[in-house]
Curated annotation (Swiss-Prot):
Segments crossing the lipid bilayer: 33-53
Keyword Membrane appears in the UniProt entry: yes
Gene: psbK
Assigned protein family: Belongs to the PsbK family.
Tagged with keyword Ligase: no
Leader sequence segment: none
Protein name: Photosystem II reaction center protein K
Cellular compartment(s): Plastid, Chloroplast thylakoid membrane
Quaternary assembly: PSII is composed of 1 copy each of membrane proteins PsbA, PsbB, PsbC, PsbD, PsbE, PsbF, PsbH, PsbI, PsbJ, PsbK, PsbL, PsbM, PsbT, PsbX, PsbY, PsbZ, Psb30/Ycf12, at least 3 peripheral proteins of the oxygen-evolving complex and a large number of cofactors. It forms dimeric complexes.
Amino acid sequence: MPNILSLTCICFNSVLYPTTSFFFAKLPEAYAIFNPIVDVMPVIPLFFFLLAFVWQAAVSFR
């Protein structure tokens, strides 16, 4: 529960003070080559969620 509360506070802080962006921070210069990978990473769990439905469709939703 404290983790959810602290995350909520962080989100509200990023809304109130948009100059310090929490979700859209830039990577350090040395890791700039990984920018395309980092942009796609939040979508990866959705692929697993969709894979569960495809798998169930393949086995006729047993």
